[in-house]
């Protein structure tokens, strides 16, 4: 390689920041600029603005933050034009990624970069098998390459001419071979409370978690891992709780999973981590009522938890929308606490192990190797 290639990398949430850092670590011979969080910045990335500005989820929530997102889109387009990277690598945050690329294609300077070889790669294939299958065609028009988590996703995109590479689920990079699975019997009754990494979801779930915690019989320890974007809010919120949970850094969450008897968790990335670590859990999610209604209309799958979808059965009980309340959580908590139910759930979670990762190679390294081969 004669010249050091430049990658403009964009991560919009914590899981993307972790994967982005793993990719950067595996590509020391490339220069990285862009948008990231604490993990990527620890490796030298100077984020052009706080990653938390992109951590918005839900149709209504995105509309509420439309002005800020528009400003960040324009800022990112300008930065890409000014820095002239060889590759734009986007990790999740598909709405933002597609808006940036669309803006570049409409900008004369952006079109000039594209004509000179600028490529667009995206990590995380949208779940077109679950809802809005038309997105596959749109992705094919937007990106030059797509990295999917699972083999079965590939045909949905290659039929439209989009080169798609299955790489396994990146969360497995931080779990497989590093942490032992949960044992089916726990002496210390530790319950992990996982309200999510986006402020919008945290604000909706924390009051529900408080009511749940205060209704659980004595004898349990509650622990909440926090990320930098939500830590201050969560610490302030729990000050008024009658039962005080322990607050730990998100960096310590895998050790928490090893010890946890059970978890109550927001739908999303954390539910995948819990499943990989064989932690019995109850999945909850409380979004804006209109977002929930639209989701019920558009989604074509019975469950939101990936482990439930992959195994085509309800392993993790799900409480979504108005069902996500303290009373229902407590009912499920009591049910899953039963020794037989608890052991059966762990056994079911172990059945998904082979689906998360095709081999022993790290996902971040696999993506890095593929990119290096292209350049």
Residue ranges and their predicted role:
Residues 1-375:
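Nucleotide-activated sugar donor-binding and catalytic core shared by glycosyltransferases
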């Amino acid at each position: 390689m004669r010249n050091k290639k430049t990658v403009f990398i964009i991560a919009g949430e914590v899981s993307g920041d972790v994967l982005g850092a793993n990719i950067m670590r595996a590509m020391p011979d490339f220069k990285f600029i862009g948008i990231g969080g604490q993990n990527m910045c620890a490796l030298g990335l100077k984020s052009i603005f706080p990653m938390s500005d992109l951590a918005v989820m839900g149709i209504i929530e995105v509309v509420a933050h439309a002005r800020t997102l528009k400003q960040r889109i324009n800022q990112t387009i300008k930065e890409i034009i000014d820095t002239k990277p060889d590759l734009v690598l986007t990790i999740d945050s598909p709405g933002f990624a597609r808006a940036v690329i669309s803006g570049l294609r409409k900008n004369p300077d952006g079109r000039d970069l594209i004509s000179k070889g600028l490529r667009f790669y995206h990590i995380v294939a949208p779940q077109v098998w679950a809802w809005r299958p038309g997105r596959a065609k749109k992705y094919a028009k937007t990106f030059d390459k797509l990295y999917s988590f699972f083999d079965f996703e590939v045909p949905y995109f290659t039929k439209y001419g989009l080169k798609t590479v299955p790489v396994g689920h990146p969360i497995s990079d931080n779990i497989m071979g590093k942490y032992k699975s949960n044992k089916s019997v726990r002496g210390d009754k530790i319950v992990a409370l996982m309200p999510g990494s986006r402020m919008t979801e945290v604000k909706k779930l924390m009051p529900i978690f408080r009511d749940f915690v205060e209704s659980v019989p004595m004898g349990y320890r509650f622990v909440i891992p926090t990320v930098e974007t939500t830590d201050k809010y969560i610490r302030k919120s729990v000050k008024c709780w009658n039962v005080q949970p322990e607050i730990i850094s998100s960096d310590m969450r895998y050790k928490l999973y090893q010890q946890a008897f059970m978890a109550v968790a927001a739908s999303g990335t954390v539910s995948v981590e819990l499943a990989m670590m064989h932690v019995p859990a109850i999945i909850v999610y409380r979004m804006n009522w209109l977002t929930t209604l639209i989701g019920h209309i558009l989604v074509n799958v019975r469950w939101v938890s990936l482990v439930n979808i992959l195994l085509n059965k309800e392993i993790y009980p799900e409480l979504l929308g108005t069902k996500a309340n303290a009373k229902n959580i407590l009912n499920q908590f009591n049910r899953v606490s039963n020794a037989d139910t608890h052991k059966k759930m762990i056994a079911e979670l172990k059945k998904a192990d082979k689906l998360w990762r095709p081999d022993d190679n790290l996902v971040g390294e696999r993506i890095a190797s593929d990119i290096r081969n292209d350049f």
